[in-house]
Amino acid sequence: MTYIHKPQLIALCSDFGNKDFRLSALKATILKENPTVNLVDISHEIPSFDLVQAAFIQSNAFRSFPEGSIHICWVFNVGEDRGILLALWEGQFFILPDNGLLSLICDQYKPEKIFRVSDDCFRFRERISSVIKHIVSEEDLSELFDPCEDPIVKINVSPVYQKDRIQSRVCFV
């Protein structure tokens, strides 16, 4: 299996906000193990646990990045811990919690590959940094991680068209 490697950019999207240490701790952990990567912030102002808004922002942003970029989209509710996924889709890598976010980003499309990086999100900063190192080092990901056949799937909200109205949800303003 051939993978697209040599990512130039790591794009970050989260619900961390900018008021505490979490974002800087994530960036420092990534750079400590991967000093040659370039970090780009997409957004860290997603409302807490809002998977729909995170998916909307991520799915609209990632196509602007060069092939082989790594996208970390971390919007996570501790009570729903099913682990960490690594997906390859449209020539880009996605690292995110297994909480349905991947299915919302990809909508009706299926990623080429999905790997389960970890069964839990404990120490996620270190795990994410390690996954990035494997990708940057051009290692065979299928030898390092098990395929994930059953990621959590969530369905995007679609508008309902009626004779005199359209009913939908606003996910981003």
Residue ranges, per PLM feature:
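N-terminal glycine-rich anion-binding loop in soluble enzyme alpha/beta folds
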Residues: 2-3, 7-45
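Active-site histidine-anchored catalytic micro-motif
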Residues: 8-9, 33-40, 45-56, 60, ...
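Generic secondary-structure boundary/loop-capping signal
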Residues: 13, 114, 149-152
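A residue-level signal for conserved active-site and pocket-lining positions in enzyme catalytic cores
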Residues: 15, 76, 131
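Conserved hydrophobic/aromatic beta-strand scaffold that supports enzyme active sites
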Residues: 15, 84-86, 170-172
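Residues that form generic nucleotide/phosphate-binding pockets
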Residues: 29, 61, 134
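Anionic-ligand-binding alpha/beta catalytic cores of soluble enzymes and soluble regulatory domains
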Residues: 120-173
